[in-house]
Amino acid sequence: MENGGQYDNARFKPDYFKGAQSMWNMIPQHQIKEQHNALVMNKKIMSILAERDAAVHERNQAVSAKKEAVAARDEALQQRDKALSERDKALIERDNAYAALQHHENSLNFALSGGKCVDGDDCFGIGEPHKLEVFPLSTIPPEVTNTKVVNKRKKENKQGLSKVKKVGEDLNRRVPAPGKKSRTDWDSQDVGLNLVTFDETTMPVPMCSCTGSTRQCYKWGNGGWQSSCCTTTLSQYPLPQMPNKRHSRMGGRKMSGNVFSRLLSRLSAEGYDLSCPVDLKDYWARHGTNRYITIK
């Protein structure tokens, strides 16, 4: 019986373990697969979210870098504008200094030359040298030895030089062109006249048609203008001679800012429409475009 019981126990043991295994295998297989798939999907979602966060972070960094670059560009543009304004101021100061120096040299040369222009042009604009009645020593008779006579002649010569200087102060006074008024006449009539200043916003740039074709003038000095249509051909009024070059003249017809303001005032009083460009052909100083000629 014992052997039989042991046999029986041994026979029923596997059935007991089979029952225990069936209890653990009660969850269906498709639910296990779904749980596995859910874990995989969660991992994928987490990786996608991490990638999105990294992309957003990179985008924010790029936006901040762009803002910094824009700020640096704006600062560079401001520095460039400041440098350009300083350069323009330096150019204006240089032009003013050059104009003042040139005017001082011309006035000094005029005074030292005794009324005769050193630049080779006649101060009266007619192309003929003005001869002073100065008696050379060779023409003085030998019997004239009285010091009073010599002193009298010196006084007469000084008076002649002073008269020439007074007339030579105004180049346009000696020989005014037909139908034109000299500068002294303008100054005498400008008393009490409201001067019209040039306004770039409402007035066009003046023109010049001295060569037959109308061309725009360039700014010169403090409010003045210079013609751009001067050529190397001969003109009615020669340009001043260059001080450092023997056979060359200064290029361009020039007009100072004060003269241009008086011209605008005169034209406005005569009823000229200042919204149209002014032709400065007939208003330049008495010198012109023959720059490269032999000066005798």
From Swiss-Prot:
Subunit structure: Homodimer. Heterodimer with BPC4.
Keywords: Coiled coil, DNA-binding, Nucleus, Transcription, Transcription regulation
Record flagged with keyword Oxidoreductase: no
Protein name in UniProt: Protein BASIC PENTACYSTEINE4
Positions of region (Alanine-zipper): 55-90
Main location as per UniProt: nucleus
InterPro entries given in the database record: GAGA-bd_tscrpt_act
